[in-house]
């Protein structure tokens, strides 16, 4: 193993320590890392890809690298309210593309870079499926945190002034889902979230 490969591997592993910004802003106790989210997304692909006639290996591989760039850029959260988006989408995409290119470079694996580009374009059924599983993972995590009472509901939080509880994570996901399967999963998770809260989720 060359030195640049070792150094790059260690940078990949930074995802294990990079906390998911949305949960941090919501003051979730011990929030998940980007790597934990990646595992959740890959697991959903593993379980459901073939059911949706998607190549399982390709989907899982795409899921494993979909947030790789955040090892260098950090996790830039997508917000439901446009005015709360701190970094323009184009700037975020450019930074992540540069990071992924650098992080894959030492391994000379053009297939991984191509899969990441395919994911970002969202033009193929596989990319749309994986993106939906990325969003579904977030909704599942919101339901899990709500059940575990991992935040102080009564605490004033300027970052989430427009939404109660963890509604914003559902509101962020809802308009971005592209597949019927993803939308169906979303409705099931949201319905359970609503039953447990005893009120409709604000979207």
Range-by-range predicted roles:
Residues 1-203:
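Alpha-helical, largely C-terminal catalytic domains
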């Amino acid at each position: 193993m060359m030195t640049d490969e070792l150094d790059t591997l260690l940078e990949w592993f930074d995802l294990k320590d990079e906390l998911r910004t949305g949960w941090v802003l919501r003051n979730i106790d011990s929030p998940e890392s980007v790597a934990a989210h990646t595992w959740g997304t890959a697991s959903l692909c593993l379980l459901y890809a073939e059911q949706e006639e998607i190549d399982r290996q390709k989907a899982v591989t795409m899921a494993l690298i979909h947030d790789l760039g955040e090892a260098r850029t950090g996790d830039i959260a997508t917000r439901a309210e446009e005015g709360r988006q701190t970094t323009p989408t184009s700037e975020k995409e450019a930074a992540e593309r540069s990071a992924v290119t650098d992080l894959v470079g030492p391994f000379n694996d053009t297939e991984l870079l191509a899969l990441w580009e395919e994911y970002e374009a969202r033009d193929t059924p596989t990319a749309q499926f994986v993106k939906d599983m990325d969003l579904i993972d977030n909704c599942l995590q919101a339901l899990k945190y709500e059940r575990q009472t991992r935040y102080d509901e009564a605490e004033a939080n300027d970052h989430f002034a427009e939404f109660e509880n963890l509604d914003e994570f559902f509101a962020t996901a809802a308009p971005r889902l592209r597949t019927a399967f993803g939308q169906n999963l979303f409705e099931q998770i949201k319905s359970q979230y609503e039953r447990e809260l005893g009120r409709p989720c604000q979207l």
